[in-house]
Amino acid sequence: MFLAQEIIRKKRNAEVLSTEEIQFFVNGITNNTVSEGQIAALGMAVYFNDMNMDERIALTTSMRDSGTVLDWKSLDLNGPIIDKHSTGGVGDVISLMLGPMAAACGGYVPMISGRGLGHTGGTLDKFDAIPGYNTEPDSALFRKVVKEAGVAIIGQTGDLVPADKRFYSIRDNTATVESISLITASILSKKLAAGLDALAMDVKVGTGAFMPTYEASEELARSITAVANGAGTKTTALLTDMNQVLASCAGNAVEVKEAVDFMTGAYRNPRLYEVTMGLCAEMLTLGGIASNEAEARAKLNEVLDNGKAAEIFGRMVSGLGGPTDFVENYSKYLPDSQIIRPVYAEQTGFATAMDTRELGLAVVTLGGGRRKPGDTLDYSVGLTKVCALGDEVSADKPIAFIHAQSEGAFAEAEAAVKKAIHIGDTKPEKTPEIYRYIRESDL
């Protein structure tokens, strides 16, 4: 028998907690025998004194096991259960293509995603722009779509990881969100509850990233790779660039359009292509579908070029209640804003830097993101044809197009976009889309 206050005292004194102590505390979070004050106190003790890898693994697996852990054995699937998770960014539409691409190559992708908050967009918000698409299906429908389409992208159900829901809301209110140990456990407990064989982790770096510096992003990537592998799920983390908008757009309906265009081959943003291929190829190699990256990329290019990935996306959309002809006729179903107009630079030159976070916040001010949880969104608004770093701009060459519902909203977003995209005389050097891979062998 343990006492919550003694566990808090140990961590306050920078001692190592046993797996049993951590399991006891997490059980208390779930069944409300540990108070909010005690949870907040442990969170702050961990924030200051940290956890070693064994403690992080114990916290992650205890939180994973606090609710239902999905089991796919009864479905007799003939491929691995694989997934990816991103720390979030602006114009990060990767999940919409990556899930169907991986499924088209023989994987099964039960992707449990989140909504946007702050400057980052949420995958579920993009799907909410599709009429009829059900992001909260019951378990039977979720499993049916995973089996039949190979991929289903839905929201977190109430019976998954209840400990994290309670712990996270308290961390959010007590300034302990930034702890790498607690971030690791929060992300991975949710992902590993999906019953995965393998996971590719996308940790963003730069002005639109969740972590403030490259060093902090790398520390998080190393922690996630070590803990996930320690918990029994093959995992690699990729450090990817978020110093500019990843797709050519940012918003909800506009990102869905770009994702469909990517899969059909109508338009593939080269930066988006590189990061999507890097993550998806890693999923295929970790899952044993491909023996190396070159083979994985060849398979992925094939399912893009022969239309199989787009077909599977369409099957997922219709399976979850969306239109059966969505891929062919998306413009019929996705909303358009009242105003769609270009923004021009004040001077001629090159796009030299981008405050990606500010561009994400511009989408929020347009109504495409949340100021607080529960806000309703306007799915039609956002930014499109956003210039890339190194692009030449001038008074007659737009830096972006703004999709707004009123003149006032347009003017506010226009000022934000002009401020966020820096113009200079010298073309900047190209930065890599993927900075590095952190595999278990690198730890």
UniProtKB/Swiss-Prot annotation:
Q: Which SMART domains match?
A: PYNP_C
Which PROSITE patterns is this protein grouped with?
A: THYMID_PHOSPHORYLASE (PS00647)
Metabolic or biological pathway: Pyrimidine metabolism; dTMP biosynthesis via salvage pathway; dTMP from thymine: step 1/2
GO cellular component terms?
cytosol
Give an example GO molecular function.
1,4-alpha-oligoglucan phosphorylase activity
Enzyme Commission numbers on file: 2.4.2.4
Q: Does the keyword Transferase apply?
A: yes
Whom does it interact with, and what assembly results?
Answer: Homodimer.
Q: What does this protein do?
A: The enzymes which catalyze the reversible phosphorolysis of pyrimidine nucleosides are involved in the degradation of these compounds and in their utilization as carbon and energy sources, or in the rescue of pyrimidine bases for nucleotide synthesis.
State the similarity comment. Belongs to the thymidine/pyrimidine-nucleoside phosphorylase family.
* Name of the protein in its database record: Thymidine phosphorylase
Q: What is the lineage of its organism?
A: Bacteria, Pseudomonadati, Pseudomonadota, Gammaproteobacteria, Alteromonadales
